[in-house]
Amino acid sequence: MSNIIKQLEQEQMKQDVPSFRPGDSVEVKVWVVEGAKKRLQAFEGVVIAIRNRGLHSAFTVRKVSNGEGVERVFQTHSPVVDSINVKRRGAVRRAKLYYLRERSGKAARIKERLNSK
């Protein structure tokens, strides 16, 4: 029974997901439906959390827009997510970067990772 479920989930998973980690700056292009129109919307920010659960994997991206912090959770293998583009690699030593919520300005900066593992 579980082999059938694993096989079905494997078929639905995207194969073109790039490798990224918390601290990386990414641009996520998402399909947005407004009435009868369908368009791509970009959301660019820092990955603060990743939840690896196979087909149900998700990641959280945070950005500051007009002085207000905005976080959005994306399902990695969702058909709504068109593409994920890694803009910059960040050097952090935590898996979850929730401490960035309390920081603003220069205190919220993340150093760039030079060697990409």
UniProtKB/Swiss-Prot annotation:
Pfam families: Ribosomal_L19
Gene3D superfamilies given in the database record: 2.30.30.790
Keyword DNA damage tagged: no
Classification via SUPFAM superfamilies: Translation proteins SH3-like domain
Taxonomy, superkingdom: Bacteria
Keywords: Ribonucleoprotein, Ribosomal protein
Disulphide-bonded residues: none
UniProt-listed GO biological process terms: translation
GO molecular function annotations of the record: structural constituent of ribosome
GO cellular component: cytosolic large ribosomal subunit
InterPro entries noted in UniProt: Ribosomal_bL19 (IPR001857), Ribosomal_bL19_CS (IPR018257), Ribosomal_bL19_sf (IPR038657), Translation_prot_SH3-like_sf (IPR008991)
Keyword Transcription regulation: no
Job description of the protein: This protein is located at the 30S-50S ribosomal subunit interface and may play a role in the structure and function of the aminoacyl-tRNA binding site.
NCBIfam families documented for this protein: rplS_bact (TIGR01024)
Entry similarity comment: Belongs to the bacterial ribosomal protein bL19 family.
Protein name: Large ribosomal subunit protein bL19
